[in-house]
Amino acid sequence: MSQLEFNVKAKFIYTKLLPLVQEASRSDVDSLCYEASDDAETVVIHYAGGGTVHVDVTADSLVALAMDVLRKVS
């Protein structure tokens, strides 16, 4: 994945997905972290009360990511 692709995905996560997740989970989400390697892409969700969720994503499945996150926090 190029640096540009990483930056675009990370920006989406932080500007679009984080507010959605916080609203869905009543602001219990402390932070989201986007990680990418040659083998996988992962969004790590850290909750304010403790706990972490790792959500695996593929290069073209940000919608699936949003749906998966919403299922996990509801």
State each model region's role:
Residues S2-E35, D56:
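N-terminal acidic leader/helix
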